[in-house]
């Protein structure tokens, strides 16, 4: 069975084998959410397959388990049964499941397909674990495969599907129909083409042929009642790296997500900036605003281009193979020139890994607002019929050993949002209900604070100007001393 790790996020992806699963060489794919390419949930389409229905097969297996008279069945109230081992299958609980399964098959007022029952059962197993563990149907699983290629047909928005199936916008992707139509981080999509979210199949209705029209109904804090936004779907080719010169000697690189080619593209565009500056930059602004994450390996590659040595990130989980560490290989491409990392409340997962790595190594100063706080790693486990399970398998830690789960990264220099970009609402309102710490059932963070103040989205050019001003302050000082700072 091939494992496809994801970081999603809402997006942090890393290949992490699970105990007891046959392993193949892991491939380097996607993140975790999005209608587009990166992070924790999104729309997608995949061709139907002739694979046998998992429900019937699993149902038969469950029945076999109950008819084996020789199999020991622990009592439901036997404490030793629960403590016997974390990986032991609770046969008594499975018997209860089979009884309910049989009752539904034999007596429910309408016929129910095995696949529907099994899919619901699997969703139920994952529902209360954490917001990022989920059952992925064929279309949703196909979306993850599209995420690393950065090409798909849709509206271009990163989404998080909540337990009530509602869709929260993590961030619109730069230059896409969603961004042009005015979709904002923190928006709640309550209907698609007039149909309530509860009546549609996940995020799939957001996908469709390029040129077709879709209408989404949005609820936004600070606005009176729902409102509609109409947009035409496009073939979304997400360019994850863009760059330009802000002023002579001062470069700017925008990373919108982390895809398979992000590391190579970053290196190429950094070299172009260096060439424009006679081989040496006075400083660099690295813009990670509204970057929902993506491939962990891509974030590691970008960090490695800016570090001579030191740890970049480590991951730790229950399975031994979940414990990994990534170190810089040497060769700072900027030769110590100062770096400012620009973040906001939409910076999540792999984006937080990069920001944390550069700051903990005293290589950059972080400017902006508090980040999302997604410090977990997801692994995608294919089920053999086109469906998959996305399971949280590890937490990641910055070089200082700190987990940002449900706490985020607090910048060295905090900026306030321009109210005109968030409908005149007070700072922090737009993303208040979509940060990791307020997601129902989120993993408790090591440094999580009750009632902490979440960050804000920081759209527009003003934050870039503020980052450049900070960069100029640093430019006349040794990079290490200038970049020092902490939470």
Predicted feature residues:
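Flexible, low-complexity junctional segments that flank or bridge functional domains
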Residues: 2-5, 10, 18-283, 290-292, ...
């Amino acid at each position: 069975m091939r494992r496809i790790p994801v970081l999603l996020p809402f997006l942090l992806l890393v290949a992490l084998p699970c105990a007891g699963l046959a392993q193949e060489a892991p491939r380097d794919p996607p993140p975790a959410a999005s209608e587009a390419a990166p992070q924790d949930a999104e729309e997608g389409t995949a061709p139907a397959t002739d694979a046998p229905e998992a429900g019937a097969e699993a149902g038969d297996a469950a029945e076999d388990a109950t008819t084996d008279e020789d199999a020991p069945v622990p009592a439901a109230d036997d404490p030793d049964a629960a403590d016997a081992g974390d990986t032991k299958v609770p046969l008594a609980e499975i018997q209860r499941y089979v009884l309910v399964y049989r009752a539904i098959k034999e007596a429910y007022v309408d016929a129910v397909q095995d696949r529907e029952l099994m899919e619901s059962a699997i969703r139920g197993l994952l529902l209360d674990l954490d917001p990022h563990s989920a059952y992925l149907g064929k279309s949703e699983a196909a979306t993850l495969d599209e995420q690393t290629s950065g090409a798909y047909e849709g509206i271009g928005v990163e989404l998080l599907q909540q337990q009530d199936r509602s869709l929260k916008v993590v961030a619109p992707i730069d230059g896409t129909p969603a961004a042009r139509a005015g979709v904002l981080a923190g928006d709640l999509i309550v209907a698609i083409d007039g149909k309530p979210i509860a009546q549609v199949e996940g995020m799939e209705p957001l996908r469709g042929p390029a040129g077709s029209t879709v209408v989404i109904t949005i609820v936004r804090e600070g606005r009176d009642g729902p409102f509609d936004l109409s947009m035409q779907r496009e073939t979304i080719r997400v360019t994850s790296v863009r760059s330009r010169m802000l002023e002579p000697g001062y470069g700017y690189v925008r990373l919108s997500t982390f895809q398979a080619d992000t590391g190579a593209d970053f290196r190429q565009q950094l070299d172009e900036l260096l060439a424009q500056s006679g081989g040496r930059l006075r400083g660099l602004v690295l813009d990670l605003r509204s970057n929902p994450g993506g491939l962990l390996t891509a974030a590691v590659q970008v960090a490695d281009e800016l570090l001579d040595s030191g740890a970049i990130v480590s991951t730790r989980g229950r399975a031994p193979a979940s414990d990994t560490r990534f170190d810089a290989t040497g060769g700072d491409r900027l030769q110590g020139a100062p770096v400012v990392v620009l973040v906001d409340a939409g910076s999540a997962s792999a984006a937080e890994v990069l920001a944390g790595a550069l700051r903990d190594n005293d290589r950059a100063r972080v400017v902006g607002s508090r980040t999302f706080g997604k410090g977990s790693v997801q692994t995608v486990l294919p089920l053999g019929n086109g469906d998959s399970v996305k399971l949280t398998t590890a937490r990641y830690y910055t070089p200082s050993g700190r987990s940002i789960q449900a706490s985020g990264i607090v910048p060295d220099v905090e900026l306030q949002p321009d109210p005109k970009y968030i409908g005149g609402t007070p700072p922090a309102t737009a993303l208040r209900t979509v940060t990791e710490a307020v997601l129902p059932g989120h993993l408790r963070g090591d440094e999580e604070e009750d009632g902490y103040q979440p960050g804000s989205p920081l759209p527009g050019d003003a934050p870039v100007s503020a980052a450049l001003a900070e960069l100029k302050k640093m430019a006349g000082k040794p990079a290490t001393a200038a970049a020092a700072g902490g939470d």
